[in-house]
A protein has these predicted regions:
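Cytosolic catalytic domains that perform sulfur/thiol-centered chemistry
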Residues: 1-282
């Protein structure tokens, strides 16, 4: 089944007993905005999981701005949200799918395949006249036992080994000006990991906020697909392991589930002063 589902698809299934809908809205720089938006209106039955409180570990010296939680800690959080090993999960946000894609990746990392991202997001759902509510769901905790997939994850040592290795392609998912080092609004150093190519994550969607077709995605991600077809490894990163996830999801949708996420991403890379930095190159 496709990892992206439509609003109409969700509407037809939203009251199924084995479904958990997760509201992932979150705004960088306004950490309270997502939960406030959820309290104001959300899809009926949805639970709220916060990017920084639930889907990330506390920030330390290394690991980036949104470190991965320990697998058992993350599994316990999902269980408290009513997500068990047999639960179907649909995630949504209003940030172009990056937070929902982070939840999709995290669940798959823990071995849970029955997880999807709703196309377009909550604003489109509400604008389309679909039902919304301000009532909170009564959550019945579930049992979630993780079955970790370590092959989905790349760490800083993996990326260091990739430097100069023709068998590995690094893919930077940030905007072109951040990749080039022309500006850096979030991190203390600007630029990118040497040898990386740039494929901005927002380009997996069209102007209307809907995910592009398979053909359009293949065109957008052509260099990555070509590399993987040649047997090369692809490691995708962004600023903190969130906005890279739509690129990872798009590649998975196109039949390339072996792609890796560098979860610490740029903010982890620059926390090591010895790591090299490049600017103004493709």
């Amino acid at each position: 089944m496709e990892p992206i589902v439509s609003k109409r698809w969700l509407l037809a299934r939203m009251y199924e007993p084995n479904l958990v809908i997760v509201d992932c809205r979150f705004e960088l720089g306004r950490p309270e905005a997502g939960s406030a938006a959820y309290d104001a209106a959300h899809i009926p039955g949805a639970v709220y999981l916060d990017l920084e409180e639930d889907l990330s570990a506390p920030v330390t010296e290394h690991g980036g701005r949104h470190p991965l939680p320990a697998p058992d800690t993350l599994a316990a959080r999902f269980a408290r949200a009513g997500i068990g090993n047999a639960t179907r999960v649909v995630a949504y946000d209003d940030q172009g799918g990056m937070n929902a894609s982070r939840l999709w990746w995290l669940l798959r990392w823990l071995g849970h395949d029955d997880v999807y991202v709703m196309d377009e997001g909550f604003a489109a759902w509400q604008a389309g006249g679909y039902p919304v509510t301000a009532e909170r769901r009564t959550v019945v905790p579930a049992a979630f036992t993780p079955s970790l997939r370590p092959h989905m994850l790349a760490g800083v040592e993996d990326v260091r080994r990739a430097l100069g290795d023709p068998g590995v392609l690094l893919v930077d998912s940030r905007a072109a000006d951040r990749f080039a080092g022309l500006q850096e609004p979030l991190d203390v150093k600007a630029g990118h990991i040497p040898g990386a190519i740039n494929r901005f994550w927002k380009q997996v969607q069209g102007d209307n906020g809907s995910w592009k077709s398979d053909g359009e995605l293949r065109e957008q991600l052509a260099p990555v697909i070509a590399a993987m077809d040649e047997g090369r490894e692809a490691i995708v990163y962004c600023g903190s392991g969130v906005s890279a996830c739509p690129n990872v999801l798009a590649l998975h949708r196109l039949g390339y589930p072996q792609v890796k996420l560098y979860a610490g991403s740029w903010s982890d890379w620059i926390s090591y002063p010895e790591n090299p930095i490049a600017t103004n190159e493709e």
